[in-house]
Amino acid sequence: MGSVAGARVKLTNADKVLYPAAGTTKGDVFDYYTRISEVMIPHIAGRPATRKRWPNGVEQESFFEKQLASSAPDWLPRASVTHRSGTTTYPIIDSLDGLAWIAQQAALEVHVPQWRFVAEWTRSKAEELKPGPATRLVFDLDPGEGVTMAQLCEVAHAVRDLITDIGLTTYPLTSGSKGLHLYTPLTEPVSSKGATVLAKRVAQQLEKAMPTLVTSTMTKSLRAGKVFLDWSQNNGSKTTIAPYSLRGREQPTVAAPRTWEELEDPELRHLRYDEVLARVARDGDLLASVDALNTRAPVRDRLTTYRSMRDASKTPEPVPSAKPATEHGNTFVIQEHHARRLHYDFRLERDGVL
């Protein structure tokens, strides 16, 4: 049996059962990912996709896959990241066809970081994708032994209230596994290091406020009876299960967006893929605001050509997301200039020209 998504991906072995306890087949997985693509893609587009594959179903062995295989289709976008162990080329899933390819690979889980690739100009005037700043925060609420869903939700509400106090908004998900995930969109991107520091401070503050229920410490022996508020997934080298991704559990559950009202329900549980499809058809994407703030196109002005000729990795110059309004078209600018020796430039900008 075969199927086609966007005339590019052919589904094979559609009747193969990947979730034996539920009878869910590879064809069902393919159908889910193609139908959920419209709401899932905004949360993973532009980010390196790590896949966790179960080629023989969830009762058999699985493996993580980062490096894009040489057999991957040419039309699939890709970009490379340099790690301590070497350089890895990742697929970028930004289309229905990309998600269909994920399903055909029996990659039930998709994991992404909190940053997106950004385009930079090289000395040869070629555009190259490089890891960019974080566009959102994520908190993984991991229950220790004996922790109930109600206690997880109590901690989630406390995180939400603390984040609200600093002027940001938080959106909850049931992870499809054991815990809850909380996403906070950033009004302006920040470095992954900065995002990690902020998330850690939030976790430590909650630990002080709720010491019998919350821990920000990774030591597993200290987690019994507590919620581990995992802030570390904001690190640029780490990933989190993507919103709307399936999970490789006994049942075909999903990392599913929820409402805060639902988190007050004592019967709150994880959702299956068919339930998530029905919810999206009814309510749309509950996370639509999470990845909508940082999708603006770069500002074009009289310096666009000049900046395109610079090597931003050597001498970066900050470019505002919106042109500042000035009464007479004149602006004084102080720029931190990373040349051979760090120095600061004091410049006059008149009508968009420095």
Place the predicted regions along the sequence by residue.
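SsDNA-processing nucleotidyl-transfer enzymes
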Residues: 1-5, 30, 35-149, 153-157, ...
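C-terminal accessory nucleic-acid interaction domains of nucleic acid-metabolism proteins
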Residues: 1-24, 30-31, 41, 45, ...
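Short beta-strand
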Residues: 52-54, 170-176, 217-221, 335-336
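Short beta-strand-to-loop capping motifs
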Residues: 141-143, 184-186, 348
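Secondary-structure boundary elements
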Residues: 161-169, 208-209
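Short, conserved phosphate-binding/catalytic loop or strand-edge motifs used
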Residues: 174-184
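Catalytic palm subdomain of template-directed nucleic-acid polymerases
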Residues: 183-196
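Subset of Sec-pathway N-terminal targeting signals
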Residues: 299-354
